Amino acid sequence: MAQAKLIDGKAFAADLRAKIAEEVAALKAEHGVTPGLAVVLVGEDPASQVYVRNKGEQTTAAGMYSETHRLPETTTQDELLAVVAKLNADPKIHGVLVQFPVPPHISQMDVVAALSPDKDVDGLTVTNAGRLASGLPALAPCTPTGCMMLIRDAIGDLKGKTAVVIGRSNLMGKPMAQMLLAADCTVTIAHSRSQDLPSIVRQADIVVAAVGRAEMVKADWVKPGAVVIDVGITRFPARDPEAAAAGKTRLVGDVAFDEVREVAGAITPVPGGVGPMTIACLLANTLTAAKRLSGIA
């Protein structure tokens, strides 16, 4: 059997960002509206700092207005919620994103509850989650939205396909399952405590791995020809000892890529698969929010 088709999330995301930039330019020219995204980061988490910097750069590159609020690790919950309230009320901001994780003394649930659902571009509020589950228009979480685009591009019509989502988080697993269900797939949500996980996964035409366990999904778990979407990211020291000593890392997904690509029909790499789609879909959500808040959409 031939190796799996490589799903190039980087190229797909670049095309999506170009389309968004065109729409942003048209929105400015026709309505005088510039979509604005504010990202709030609490603390010094290195991975979060990279994500936040990338979000800011890509927001600006798409022609949008970008704000980044960097708060110290010692910021209290009340101080953070005050920043969120200010951004909720700011007319030039259409999307508000608090970068998670936040320090342990701050409740992530309380932060999400404080976000205006109209500006909740991560799709985490109860309002947006409920709308998504009910099949109503919603600002949906960015990573599963990006995954759906890649799956549709790889397969086309999803009706009647069997899908297994490994992972049950509010940010990824649950909304991913809702989206696949809305596309008329038969969906199973599995997780690290599911019994006989390999046999569950082996039934699937579509596998979405989002559990955060490096290379957990092996070749003998995967049905020949299946589409495999790897959302997991685990950092390991670089293979080269000198690079590792210098603090360099390598990213590994939830799928044992080298062996699974010999079985699957299509597969996303890590990095370069799902990751670039997440920020592109964040920009798309910000554009949608700007249109809705301006009475255009």
UniProtKB/Swiss-Prot annotation:
Binding site for NADP(+): 167-169, 192, 233
GO cellular component, one term: cytosol
GO biological process: L-histidine biosynthetic process; methionine biosynthetic process; purine nucleotide biosynthetic process; tetrahydrofolate interconversion
Record-listed E.C. numbers: 1.5.1.5, 3.5.4.9
One example GO MF annotation: methenyltetrahydrofolate cyclohydrolase activity
Keywords, alphabetical: Amino-acid biosynthesis, Histidine biosynthesis, Hydrolase, Methionine biosynthesis, Multifunctional enzyme, NADP, One-carbon metabolism, Oxidoreductase, Purine biosynthesis
Pathway: One-carbon metabolism; tetrahydrofolate interconversion
Catalyzed reactions: (6R)-5,10-methylene-5,6,7,8-tetrahydrofolate + NADP(+) = (6R)-5,10-methenyltetrahydrofolate + NADPH; (6R)-5,10-methenyltetrahydrofolate + H2O = (6R)-10-formyltetrahydrofolate + H(+)
Pfam families: THF_DHG_CYH (PF00763), THF_DHG_CYH_C (PF02882)
Gene3D superfamilies: Leucine Dehydrogenase, chain A, domain 1, NAD(P)-binding Rossmann-like Domain
Function in brief: Catalyzes the oxidation of 5,10-methylenetetrahydrofolate to 5,10-methenyltetrahydrofolate and then the hydrolysis of 5,10-methenyltetrahydrofolate to 10-formyltetrahydrofolate.
Family of the protein in this entry: Belongs to the tetrahydrofolate dehydrogenase/cyclohydrolase family.
Subunit structure, interactors included: Homodimer.
Name under which the protein is recorded: Bifunctional protein FolD
Species annotation: Caulobacter vibrioides (strain NA1000 / CB15N) (Caulobacter crescentus)
Gene name of this polypeptide: folD
